[in-house]
A protein has these predicted regions:
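C-terminal or mid-to-C-terminal helical accessory/interaction module adjacent to the motor/catalytic core
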Residues: 136-173
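Conserved acidic, small-residue-rich alpha-beta core segments centered on
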Residues: 123-134
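Acidic, metal-coordinating catalytic cores used for nucleic-acid/nucleotide bond scission
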Residues: 74, 95, 114-124, 142-147
Length: 173
């Protein structure tokens, strides 16, 4: 049986661009099954050590000396399409020290862009502890309740998104 049948598939790359695995989102929200599905864990693919979008974002993260972290694949894609390229995703999982180590190779500044719902706030708070423990500077930018970086950005220009991120990002400490 095709593991990813009826799903949009997102290739997940290493920092060097090698395809390590896939994430997939169900197309029909009516089905009673997991919304997201990933490649099985293996020696090559370990979700907790990978950041979605890192291969495409790494140069801009280093250039701008800041990394935006979002929750999901579509958040990364939408922001990249709008021109905000220094964005990666924790792929819906809590941030890990391995993921932060990847970012630390590029910058010491992280801005968390998580959903405006309770789960997003909780994920942000958990991630902040790991980022601070790793010795990085952390800022937080929240979105209006019910919005995530993807939905917020859909009808906005690059300039509007950039202004929002600059005006609503707050140093955590």
């Amino acid at each position: 049986i095709d593991r990813f049948r009826g799903r949009v598939i997102f290739p997940i790359h290493s920092m060097s661009g090698r395809t390590l695995g896939f994430g997939a989102r169900i197309l029909n929200n009516q089905l009673k099954t997991a919304k997201y599905l990933n490649s099985p864990e293996s020696l090559i693919y370990n979700k907790s050590t990978i950041l979605y979008g890192i291969f495409y974002a790494k140069q801009e993260i280093a250039k701008l000396d800041n990394c935006f972290i979002v929750e999901g694949y579509t958040d990364v894609i939408q922001l990249h399409q709008k021109g905000v390229m220094n964005v990666v995703s924790s792929s819906g999982t809590a941030l890990t020290i391995d993921q932060i180590t990847l970012i630390r190779r590029l910058t010491s500044n992280v801005t968390m862009l998580f959903d405006g719902d309770k789960a997003g706030v909780n994920a942000t708070l958990r991630g902040i502890d790991i980022i601070l423990t790793a010795g990085l500077n952390v800022s937080v930018c929240s979105f209006p309740n019910g919005e995530d970086p993807d939905s917020y950005s859909q009808d906005k220009s690059y300039e509007e998104i950039d202004d929002y991120l600059k005006n609503n990002s707050q140093d955590f400490i």
